[in-house]
Design a protein with these regions (language model features):
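An aromatic- and glycine-enriched ligand-binding surface/loop that stacks and positions planar moieties
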Residues: 22-80, 187, 210-213, 218-394
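Long, intrinsically disordered, low-complexity segments
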Residues: 21-24, 79-80, 94, 107-108, ...
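Bacterial Sec-dependent N-terminal signal peptides
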Residues: 3-4, 15-43, 182, 217, ...
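Conserved, well-structured interaction surfaces
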Residues: 40-59, 81-153, 169, 173-180, ...
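Short coil/turn linking the two alpha-helices of tandem helical-hairpin repeats
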Residues: 148-157, 222-229, 468
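C-terminal substrate/ligand-recognition segments
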Residues: 348-478
Length: 569
């Protein structure tokens, strides 16, 4: 069979959210209407734009996010289930890895969908202002997908236009050329000023001017590291400050991440993959698995639990990043569990905490997961709040020395050994959906936040630090740090300080692997904090500082050869 890159992209498109590619792009579809006729209408053109956005779900609304962006870092560990072992320990990572192939394929499918908007805009019966805005949004979408590609794979083929005929392939462009293309596209769209100023409080699902600037800031930051362009750090800092626009972080962290979704449209969430239970076509299994991430096993479907992936639990490093007084800890982790077995006398379950007003006061508490910094006195003070229901609560410290969690038999147990048991660690509640309160997967209808205002403060902090301006770096970092209820940091900061802050602010929702790759700390941090690798991190990772170009992509592209593969594979 002839090798064509087009066929790979088209196949990926068919796996997306459209009914099928042929229904929309084939001139001989059921209605006998050509693609140009279909997409010339306002409704048809808008369907193209919506489809371009929906391709993001393949990356962010699926387990692909955790395996590609959370595994193999300093923050997450195996539990009863192992995460993707090849991506977590690198030793067996090859170009045949399914998750990496899917990431690559989905991103190019998204680019193709975005490019189709510009192509069909030429004949679309839409007013010029709307057309300019929608084409601008699509161009930024494609630029963002290239940003993800270059940060994971380095140099990749660049497809600037929508393919209407089969093509035998595209050559691999250098990382420098990919960055240059992203920057050029973003600067051009921003300069045209065709986008909405902000969409954060309008749902946050559409690209805006501040979104485009945020992506450009992140692009300059990555390119500065990867291409050794010192002036790009200053550009990244200036753009991040433009996005910040003098805004302070004033909303309490717990309110932002409230499980009922009431914080999802806060101005701090600049860009989202949007979900909405009220308008969902499928309200029982049409959501995402986000509420089940970063949690150990809690029981079977017969129990009053929430579904969990039983993997990606916090490492001891991640837990210790949270200092005493950090308000983000209690908003990130569920510390109290009642009896959640089916038919228990109190008729309680995992979701009782929400149904009882975000508290278990008045309900018997079976397990209490104390933070690493909590003392015996702190535990006794907590029990004294509701002594009748907490007298017999079993305490499981979230520290290196813990207590056996499953049978509550009081045995001392190492933290990582405990993760092989039921109830081994404090469940992550940051992404809970209390509106569905389900024990099934795919029932989270909360928005997925791709870019946030706190992230822009951290981008600015990193960029100013690398540009040699410690006072400004410290000020940007402290805006995030102090919002969490912590005293201001002083003195000279390091990249480790920023990564530690990021771990607390963005536990679970940040592409941690990309952060460590970008900052050239992947090996050192995995050596210190990745329980599965430890001292073998340098050996296992070796030259694998980028993801492998999928073998299927090389086979399907006449202009790629094995010489284009990334080092280490």
């Amino acid at each position: 069979m002839k090798k064509i890159l087009y066929s790979v992209a088209l196949a990926a498109c068919c796996m997306g959210t459209m009914t099928s590619c042929s229904d929309f792009l084939d001139a001989s579809n059921k209605s006998n209407v050509t693609d140009k006729q279909t997409f010339a209408t306002k409704e048809g053109f808008n369907s193209l734009v919506n489809d371009a956005y929906q391709h993001l779900q393949n990356v962010y609304a699926a387990p692909l996010f955790t395996s590609c962006f959370s595994a193999g870092t300093d923050m997450y560990a195996d539990a009863r289930n192992k995460m993707n072992e090849a991506l977590n320990t690198y030793e067996t990572l090859t170009p045949e890895n399914t998750d990496i192939k899917n990431l690559y394929t989905y991103l190019y499918a998204g680019i193709r969908a975005a490019n189709s908007v510009s192509y069909y805009a030429q004949t679309a019966q839409v007013d010029d202002k709307t057309k300019g805005q929608l084409v601008g949004e699509a161009r930024v979408l494609a630029a963002y997908e290239y940003y993800l590609l270059v940060n994971n794979f380095g140099g990749v083929p660049i497809m600037k236009d929508f393919l209407t005929t089969a093509d035998t392939g595209y050559p691999k462009s250098s990382a420098e050329d990919v960055y240059a293309y992203i920057i050029s596209e973003l600067k051009d769209v921003i300069g045209k000023n065709v986008l909405q100023a902000s969409t954060a409080t309008k749902g946050g699902g559409r690209i805006s001017q501040e979104t485009a600037k945020a992506i450009l800031a992140k692009t300059y930051l990555s390119a500065a590291w990867d291409l050794n362009k010192q002036d790009y750090f200053s550009k990244a800092a200036a753009l991040a400050d433009e996005v910040i626009a003098g805004r302070r972080l004033t909303t309490p962290f717990a309110k932002l991440w409230k499980a009922d979704g009431s914080g999802d449209d806060n101005e701090e969430f600049l860009w989202d993959v949007e979900y909405d239970l009220a308008t969902a076509n499928n309200t029982t299994s049409g959501g995402t698995e986000w509420s089940s991430y970063y949690c150990n096993y809690l029981g079977g479907n017969e129990d009053n639990i929430k579904a969990t992936t039983s993997s990606y639990v916090p490492t001891l490093y991640a837990l210790h990043c949270f200092k005493k007084g950090d308000q983000r800890y209690d908003a990130t982790f569920m510390k109290e569990l009642p009896d959640i077995n089916k038919g228990n006398a109190a008729n309680t379950g995992y979701w009782t905490w929400y149904k009882n007003g975000e508290s278990l006061v008045g309900k018997p508490v079976t397990r209490y997961y104390s933070a690493w910094y909590e003392t015996d006195a702190d535990f006794e003070a907590w029990k004294a709040i509701d002594p009748a229901n907490r007298a017999n609560t079993y305490r499981i410290p979230m520290d290196s020395q813990s207590k056996e969690a499953q049978n509550m038999d009081g045995r001392d147990m190492e933290y990582y050994d405990n993760q092989q048991l039921v109830y081994g660690s404090s469940p992550c509640k940051k992404f809970d959906d209390s509106q569905t309160a389900s024990n099934q997967k795919n029932t989270c209808y909360r928005d997925i936040h791709i870019i946030t205002l706190p992230e822009m403060y951290l981008v600015a902090a990193e960029a100013y630090l690398k540009a040699g301006d410690n006072p400004k770096a410290l000020a940007r970092l402290n805006e995030v740090h102090q919002r969490a209820g912590l005293p201001a940091l002083t003195g000279t900061i390091t990249i480790d300080d920023i990564l530690d802050e990021n771990a607390c602010e963005n536990f679970g929702n940040e592409a941690r692997w990309m952060d460590l790759r970008r900052t050239q700390t992947l090996v050192t941090r995995c050596t210190k904090y990745n329980h599965e690798m430890g001292d073998k991190a340098a050996q296992y990772i070796g030259k694998k500082l980028l993801r492998p170009i999928p073998q299927a992509a090389i086979d399907a592209n006449d202009q790629l050869t094995l010489a284009d593969q990334n080092p280490g594979y």
